[in-house]
From Swiss-Prot:
GO molecular function, one term: DNA binding
Organism of provenance: Ralstonia solanacearum (Pseudomonas solanacearum)
Highest taxon, organism lineage: Bacteria
Family to which this protein belongs: Belongs to the autoinducer-regulated transcriptional regulatory protein family.
Keywords: Activator, DNA-binding, Quorum sensing, Transcription, Transcription regulation
Residues in the DNA-binding region annotation: 193-212
KW Cell membrane (keyword) present: no
PANTHER family (alphabetical): DNA-BINDING TRANSCRIPTIONAL ACTIVATOR DEVR_DOSR, HTH LUXR-TYPE DOMAIN-CONTAINING PROTEIN
Protein name: Transcriptional activator protein SolR
Length: 236
């Protein structure tokens, strides 16, 4: 069944929260011929363990098994999506570390699948996956999916981000002044407070005043963390 993209766009835009939006995404996935749908978003922070949000209609128990087995860290679909926005067709790799992933997926009824990634200005990475238990993909279907998934993945991620990013990356809500951004940029260049003061023609005390304000706004413990957070969220 060919989706009505105009109606879908309206339904997406009027979704009141991320859960309603995902239900609309899953409905389009079914119209495209896929039993199952998954949308995952990975935030740029925390750096050591980025926050992740996952929504899915997979068979009961699969996502719990996926997460408990640490498949997210070895999933070649995620790896491919992180480096390319092209249509990804399962299986992406038959490397030894992913062999169990594909085997377990087939056992769960996830035999055929495609995925498409996208990014937002805040550095959030999104991956949309469509899957089914049977019916191999044809060349004609892949041609259709190349267009449909590009539209669906990008719109889904664009509209999901305003729901998810403020929750998972509260630093993204920070509003920095022009001077605070300048001080952060020069800090990122390795300049000391004294040197930044000379460059901006302000006192060292004023530089430190702006730095302290930034630390509070970004919930950072030091200047290094503040710069990392600001870059990761697109604030500078």
């Amino acid at each position: 069944m060919e989706p009505d993209f105009q109606d879908a766009y309206h339904a997406f835009r009027t979704a009141e929260d991320e859960h309603q939006l995902f239900r609309e995404i899953a409905a389009i996935a079914r119209q495209l011929g896929f039993d199952y749908c998954c949308y995952g978003a990975r935030m740029p922070l925390p750096v050591s363990k980025p926050a992740v949000a996952i929504f899915d209609t997979y068979p009961a128990g699969w996502m719990q098994h996926y997460q408990a087995s640490g498949f997210l860290d070895i999933d070649p679909t995620v790896r491919a999506g992180a480096s390319s926005s092209d249509l990804i067709v399962w299986p992406v790799s038959i490397r030894d570390d992913a062999a169990r992933l594909w085997s377990d997926a087939r056992d769960a009824g996830l035999n055929i699948g495609v995925a498409r990634s996208s990014w937002t200005a805040h550095g959030a990475f999104g991956l949309l996956t469509l899957a089914r238990h049977a019916d191999p993909l044809t060349a004609a279907e892949l041609g259709q999916l190349s267009i449909a998934t590009h539209w669906l993945a990008n719109l889904a991620h664009t509209l999901m981000s305003p729901f998810l990013v403020p929750q998972l990356v509260p630093e993204s809500n920070a509003v920095l002044t022009t001077r605070e951004r300048e001080v952060l940029c020069w800090t990122g260049e390795g300049k000391t407070a004294y040197e930044i003061g000379q460059i901006l023609r302000i006192s060292e005390r004023t530089v430190n005043f702006h730095v302290n304000n930034v630390l509070l706004k970004l919930a950072a413990t030091n200047k290094v963390q503040a710069v990392v957070k600001a870059i990761a969220t697109g604030l500078i």
